[in-house]
Regions:
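P-loop NTPase motor domains
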Residues: 1-202, 215, 220
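Conserved H-loop
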Residues: 207-216
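A short helix-turn-beta junction within AAA+ P-loop NTPase domains corresponding to the substrate/partner-engaging
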Residues: 220-228
Length: 228
């Protein structure tokens, strides 16, 4: 899940992951957003890639982080970790680790997000007119895990739709994304997904029960009615 093919996709994924963690945390601040965003970007920038398991180790293991940064070419990211982060200290990563530990505690979830070499290629699903079903039952994996995994999947399909900028319009295979209880997976990128999905031949079928469920995401509500 932690993979991206362009700078835009990397920025999108990092932003979405920060928003997901912020929504799940009772105590969150700008410093935590900065630390988590730069950690995700470091993994995405490295040719070695990374997983959410690597993300946790990157935050707590100084040696592991130092070795990882050797393969990161983005000077802004390396400057943050080598110069700014030591001034911040580890106090900023507590809520981040709490969410990661909750998420990775489930062996089922670890099997999904802990693979550097993906066995499921969502691009092939999207371009090959295939069907992909994700059962995100809160009773099976927990409410927070369902939200985190569902939001990451929505973000992933958004990345794949943006990658279609490199394709001729005639070559963009129509694909339809169905999201039940979609307000549970709302991230900032959902707004741009709603406004820009059509030109990338991505259709969205979003189900919810009442309009009151959308009050927590007003920008998405506006984009939803504007593009219905």
């Amino acid at each position: 899940i932690l993979s991206a093919g362009s700078d835009i996709e990397r920025t999108l994924l990092a932003s979405d992951l920060v928003s997901i963690f912020r929504r799940l945390s009772t105590s969150w601040g700008d410093t935590m957003s900065t630390v988590l965003g730069n950690a995700v970007l470091a993994l995405l920038e490295s040719p070695s890639g990374g997983t959410l398991i690597d993300l946790r180790r990157f935050l707590v293991d100084d040696r592991f982080r130092k070795d990882y940064l050797e393969s990161v070419e983005d000077e802004e990211i390396t400057f943050f970790w080598r110069r700014e982060y030591p001034l911040i200290g580890s106090r900023a990563i507590g809520p981040i680790l709490t969410r990661l530990d909750t998420f990775l505690r489930s062996k089922l979830i670890r099997h999904v997000v802990g693979q550097k070499q993906a066995k499921l290629h969502l691009r092939a699903v999207m371009e090959g007119r295939k069907i992909f079903l994700a059962k995100l039952s809160q009773g099976l994996i927990g409410e927070e895990n369902a939200y985190l995994l569902g939001s990451l999947l929505v973000s992933k399909f958004h990345q794949l739709s943006l990658a279609r900028q490199q394709q001729a319009k005639a070559d963009r295979t129509p694909f339809y994304l169905y999201a039940d209880e979609f307000q549970s997976f709302a991230t900032p990128s959902m707004e741009s997904l709603l406004t820009g999905a059509r030109k990338y031949r991505l259709g969205l079928i979003l189900a919810h029960q009442t309009l009151a469920q959308l009050e927590a995401v007003p920008k998405i509500t506006s984009a939803l009615f504007g593009n219905a």
